[in-house]
Structures are given as C-alpha cells and as structure tokens.
A protein has these predicted regions:
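Glycine- (often His-adjacent) and acidic-residue-rich active-site loop
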Residues: 5, 62-99, 115, 145
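Hydrophobic/aromatic residues within transmembrane alpha-helices
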Residues: 23, 60, 72, 122-123
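Conserved CoA-thioester-binding segment of acyl-CoA-metabolizing enzymes
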Residues: 1-63, 98
Length: 161
C-alpha cells in the first residue's frame, strides 16, 4: 500500500485487485457521516491518487447501510454558526469537485443505501456510478433550511438525461 494512504484517518483503503484502490468512506458499520476531517481528506485524496503511478483505477464505496449520510451534526452546526469555517468548507467543496473531475484515474462509485452530501458529490462525479436497487440519492439541504444547489443538484439531472 502506498505510504501516503497511512496519513488518512477517516477514509479506509484496500486493494481488491492489483492496482485497483478501493476507498471506503468512514466506518463501514455506521451510516458514514462526513466529519470535518473526512471532508478535508475527501478533498486531498484525489490529487494523491492522480499522482500515484501504482494505482490504475479507484472504487469508491460507503458502509453497509449507507453510501454517505451527509455531514455529521458537528460539521453542519459549525458551518451554520462559524462564518470562517463555512467559507473554508465551501472552498474545500469547490476543490473536491475539481479534484474528482481532474483525477485521471477512472473512478467507479458503488452506491448502496442513502447517498447524501460530500460522499454523494464524489459518487455522482465518478466516471461510472453503479447504484443498487436500494440506493437513494438525497439532497439534504432543504431539510436544513438551505437552498438546494450544490454540485449534486447540478450533476444528477445530467446523468439521468
């Protein structure tokens, strides 16, 4: 395993086949909420993968119950109450979109269960998105009183036609 992968704490890695990296977002036994730390890791991992000559393809997956549960409550609360943190998170989200799109390795997302938030962004921006019969694509913004309009709201209709 590439040494830099050990620097990531909230993303889990394994190689199901030679040169194929599988990324599991968070604890596979939980609903995979995205913490501030995981959000930051999701931004930087794509540049690391792109530069890694030992990786030819990526599979992105979540836990057994959910692909991604969206931002954890601490992340959401801090984003709502701390202007500077909110601006940092928005910048990270912009970088997340660019980094996934600019990664030259094929990315395949395996979406099972609910898919919300930053995990959903990565899933929908993947080169190939495979959704199970129980996959649910959810924009959680309206539930928080926030207008829908992140990249998920833009990219999903483009995928569906």
């Amino acid at each position: 395993m590439s040494a830099y992968l050990k620097n990531y704490e909230e993303l889990l890695f394994d190689f199901p086949a030679p040169r194929v990296l599988r990324i599991t977002m968070g604890d596979p036994e939980r609903l995979t909420p995205v913490s501030g730390k995981m959000h930051a890791e999701m931004v930087t991992i794509w540049n690391d993968i792109d530069a890694d000559e030992d990786i030819s393809a990526v599979i992105l997956t979540g836990g057994k119950k959910a692909f991604s549960a969206g931002g954890d409550f601490a992340l959401v609360e801090k984003s709502m109450s701390d202007f500077h943190f909110r601006m940092q998170t928005w910048k990270e989200t912009r970088s997340l979109v660019y980094n996934v799109i600019n990664c030259n390795k094929p990315i395949i997302s395996a979406i099972r269960g609910p898919a919300v938030g930053a995990g959903l962004v990565c899933g929908l921006l993947s080169d190939v998105s495979i959704a199970s019969k129980n996959a649910r694509i959810i924009d959680g913004h309206p539930r928080l009183g926030v207008a829908a309009g992140d990249v998920s709201a833009i990219i999903w209709p483009l995928h569906c036609g």
